[in-house]
């Protein structure tokens, strides 16, 4: 199916990028295992599953890690989240942790605490809500992916956005 095709292609494209930057793919936490199960059920879910791939960038303190993430909701997003090691879940941390993130990664745009999960994110493929892929209510972009050339172009545009977002933590 198209979701699997997109995810496999994105993972193939970003794996070398994360290795090059020293990010570590998460597969140790029960969160990851739960997410993988959610990914398999994405289309059948009545609600958004918010699944995806997570890569550890760095520890912020003993309780929190900064993760790079490709997230699948109704659309695709790439960005940074904090992971609470003790609670085994993604969440925005306390003010001191947010200040530590800002200090350690000054390229993260100001006003970076977007919502309860994200530190910063951009929509894929081009951080434009009007051109975002929609896996829940199939839009024109979704249907265009069945054309091989348009699929390649989509993956390349996603890769460019992902690279730009990853470079914030260089």
Describe each region flagged by the PLM.
Residues 123-169:
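Mid-to-C-terminal oligomerization/interaction "stalk" domains of large proteins
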């Amino acid at each position: 199916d198209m979701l699997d095709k997109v995810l496999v292609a994105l993972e193939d494209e970003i794996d070398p990028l994360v290795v090059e930057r020293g990010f570590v793919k998460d597969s140790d936490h029960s969160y990851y295992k739960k997410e993988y199960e959610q990914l398999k059920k994405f289309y059948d879910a009545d609600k958004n599953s918010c699944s995806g791939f997570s890569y550890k960038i760095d520890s912020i303190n003993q309780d929190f890690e900064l993760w790079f993430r490709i997230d699948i909701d109704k659309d695709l997003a790439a960005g940074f989240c904090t992971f609470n090691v003790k609670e085994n879940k993604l969440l925005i941390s306390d003010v001191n942790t947010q200040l530590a993130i800002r200090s350690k990664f000054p390229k993260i745009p100001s006003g970076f605490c977007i919502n309860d999960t994200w530190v910063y994110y951009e929509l894929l493929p081009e951080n434009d809500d009007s051109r975002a892929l929609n896996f829940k209510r199939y839009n024109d972009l979704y249907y265009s992916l069945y054309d091989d050339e348009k699929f390649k172009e989509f993956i390349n545009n996603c890769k460019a956005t992902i690279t730009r977002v990853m470079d914030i933590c260089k």
